[in-house]
Amino acid sequence: MSVFNLTVVSAEQQIFSGQVESIQATGIEGELGILAGHTPLLTAIKPGIVKLTLEDGKEEVIYVSGGFLEVQPNVVTVLADTAIRGDELDGDRILAAKKRAEENIRTRHGDANYEMLASKLSKELAKLRAYELTEKLVKNKR
């Protein structure tokens, strides 16, 4: 299968740079699958998972807090405020943050911004999915 260069960058650092066979991400208008030779594209992506298939066929998962995905001939770039490799996520911390977010929604006061609280919960759920998918991929390698 053909490969292309992918770079995933957060506000703090470069998370990934290398050759991949494909990537999957969630755009604002739905799921995206990018292969070599894809039509040029610039789109916003939602908080969630960017799944990479490396040139050796192995898969890797990266959590992104949202951002942009740009496709150019033979080069794809993902720009995100926050990006964390799945194997760097801490399941216990994610579950604790998810629980706090749920509690904040349940007990919110009149001045609390529901959309902000729901967004925080959504991001924690996306991190949890990235963590669980990474754990599943690691388990399947054994």
From Swiss-Prot:
Protein known as: ATP synthase epsilon chain
CDD domains: F1-ATPase_delta
GO cellular component terms given for this protein: plasma membrane; proton-transporting ATP synthase complex
Organism: Pasteurella multocida (strain Pm70)
Family membership noted in the UniProt record: Belongs to the ATPase epsilon chain family.
HAMAP family: ATP_synth_epsil_bac
Location of this chain's protein in the cell: Cell inner membrane
UniProt keyword annotations, A-Z: ATP synthesis, Cell inner membrane, Cell membrane, CF(1), Hydrogen ion transport, Ion transport, Membrane, Transport
Keyword Cell membrane found: yes
InterPro entries per UniProt: ATP_F1_dsu/esu_C_sf, ATP_synth_F1_dsu/esu, ATP_synth_F1_dsu/esu_N, ATPsynth_dsu/esu_N
Matches recorded under SUPFAM superfamilies: Epsilon subunit of F1F0-ATP synthase C-terminal domain, Epsilon subunit of F1F0-ATP synthase N-terminal domain
MF terms (GO), sorted A to Z: ATP binding; proton-transporting ATP synthase activity, rotational mechanism
Membrane topology per record: Peripheral membrane protein
